């Protein structure tokens, strides 16, 4: 058995952060989503709680935690991220790795299985190298999640904490993220598959490019992103939110020696699932049941882009001015009500359904199985608003 499996540290550091950077977390109906995940974990024989427990017991995480304690009392994002890992681990659904495992099991062994694969012991229909890939995928996402917690010190105020503490938090975010990413790269090399390494390496490059081009959540008047269309949105969201899952699914097929057609189908599933969930996430501020809840959303989110394209730039700028308070801050509750009067929200829902259906379509050629059904349930869950 490949011993790399037990050496990957901190795989469970996932999906808890700020600034709307969560992916495939519980944005759909809690009971429905949790059941989908629980059923899927039983199928792959790989509960996410086990991954989190091994992470929490690792020496590396213990050392990081000791330093992060120095940030207590500040508003540095790294502290909240770390708190989420420890105290909200039940919600840390490592969905990228879970999807990779389900895809591996659904596709099964290839007809072109080589001798080196035959010698590997499959567990629950999944090769050890594919399980390692699932953990590597989680580790890469975790590294970028930690990196996104870096604070712009130009916006620092005394209420955030001392400048020295915020600088220290930034250093910890950079070093911790780099450490996790280095471990992921080491794990990639141990897969001994150049095509898989190439795919995941390109996904890392996509993440860097996507995050670089990501717009801030709340934009000023001179940076409203009027030139951003849904085509641009999809390109940027795929780089920052979809490339890792899509290429990890494809790499899982490569590790089992599946042909290019199967690899392409796995890639399409990951791509459409990612975009579907991102749309679901951006819909949440507009479909919450309680209108009294405080609400914020990106002015470059899909519902806003659709709305802007419907009403035109001139009317959109007028609506923005009307939604501003005396202090020139945007009243997002008022702006949300304005946007909901048009078709932006329903258009986003339609696009979400489209990506869900395309994800479902991409796996229909796989043999009927519990794993395929679980993938279908996950794709359907992103349309539960």
What are these regions (language model features)?
Residues 28-32, 102-111, 115-119, 145-167, ...:
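Acidic, Mg2+-coordinating active-site segments of isoprenoid diphosphate-utilizing enzymes
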Residues 185-202, 313, 320-321:
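Transmembrane helix-loop-helix
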């Amino acid at each position: 058995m490949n011993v790399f499996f037990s050496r990957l540290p901190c795989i469970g550091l996932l999906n808890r952060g700020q600034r709307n950077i969560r992916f495939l977390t519980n944005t759909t109906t809690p009971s429905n989503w949790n059941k989908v995940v629980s059923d899927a974990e039983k199928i792959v024989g790989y509960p996410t709680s086990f991954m989190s427990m091994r992470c929490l017991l690792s020496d590396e995480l213990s050392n990081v935690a000791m330093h992060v304690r120095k940030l207590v009392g500040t508003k540095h994002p790294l502290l909240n991220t770390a708190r989420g890992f420890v105290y909200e681990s039940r919600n840390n659904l490592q969905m990228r790795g879970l999807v990779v495992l389900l895809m591996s099991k659904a596709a099964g062994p290839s007809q072109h299985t080589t001798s080196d694969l035959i010698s590997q012991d499959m567990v629950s229909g999944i090769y050890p190298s594919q399980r390692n890939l699932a953990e590597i995928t989680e580790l890469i996402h975790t590294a970028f999640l930690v990196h996104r917690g870096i604070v712009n010190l130009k916006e620092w105020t005394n209420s955030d904490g001392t400048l020295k503490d915020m600088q220290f938090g930034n250093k910890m975010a950079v070093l911790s993220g780099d450490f996790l990413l280095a471990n992921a790269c080491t794990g990639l090399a141990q897969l001994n598959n150049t095509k898989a390494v190439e795919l995941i390496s390109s996904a890392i490059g996509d993440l860097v490019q996507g995050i670089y081009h990501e717009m801030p959540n709340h934009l000023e008047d001179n940076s409203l992103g009027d030139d951003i269309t849904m085509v641009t949105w999809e390109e940027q969201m795929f780089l920052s939110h979809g490339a890792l899952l899509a290429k990890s699914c494809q790499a899982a097929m490569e590790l089992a020696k599946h042909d290019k057609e199967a690899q392409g189908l796995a890639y399409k599933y990951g791509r459409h699932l990612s975009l579907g969930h991102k749309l679901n996430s951006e819909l949440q501020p507009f479909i919450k049941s309680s209108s009294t809840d405080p609400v914020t959303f990106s002015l470059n989110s899909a519902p806003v882009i659709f709305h802007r394209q419907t009403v035109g730039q001139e009317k959109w700028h007028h609506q923005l001015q009307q939604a501003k308070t005396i202090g020139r801050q945007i009243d997002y509750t008022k702006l949300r009500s304005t946007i909901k009067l048009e078709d932006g929200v329903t258009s986003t829902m339609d696009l979400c359904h489209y990506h869900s259906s395309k994800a479902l379509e991409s796996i229909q050629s796989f043999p009927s199985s519990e794993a395929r059904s679980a993938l279908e349930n996950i794709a359907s869950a992103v349309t539960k608003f």
